[in-house]
């Protein structure tokens, strides 16, 4: 017997949770999760992905402000800082144009695009056929990390 669970799918976020700046759209999904998108056509993706099927969540408390050429979005858990009209994919780790600062066990942790995460606990593998030895090198980054942050690339999850 096959049982089916109905899930309310509403991938379009509440407009009150969205902050746009030029080619960028930031969606504050929870105090700990900000969805970051860039589109030179300013056409953003609202379809569900395999990872996220519902983005219409209660809007968390946050503030956003533009000052001195930067957009800042702050929740009680993190602070995002974006250099307005810059491309986050072209980023200098010493002076990132997009960064998120959060607190992990009383210490500040900073994330920026393309930052390597040596403490990611990795995802899963489809099969162990022909596996020999350590299979961790096969695994992509997962949703949990000892670094205090993880990145989900929804472009690859459609």
Regions found by a protein language model. Name each.
Residues 12, 16, 59-61, 109, ...:
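Generic low-complexity segments that are intrinsically disordered, proline-rich and/or Lys/Arg-biased
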Residues 1-3, 19, 90, 151:
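Generic low-polarity alpha-helical segments
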Residues 8, 17-19, 25-27, 59-66, ...:
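Short, exposed beta-strand/loop patches in secreted or surface proteins that constitute
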Residues 8, 53-57, 123-126:
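Short Pro/Gly-enriched beta-strand edge/turn motifs at strand-loop
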Residues 2-13:
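Bacterial Sec-dependent signal peptides at the C-terminal "C-region" and cleavage site
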Residues 66-158:
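Catalytic and substrate-binding clefts that recognize carbohydrates or anionic sugar/phosphate headgroups
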Residues 12-38:
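N-terminal-proximal low-complexity accessory segments that begin disordered
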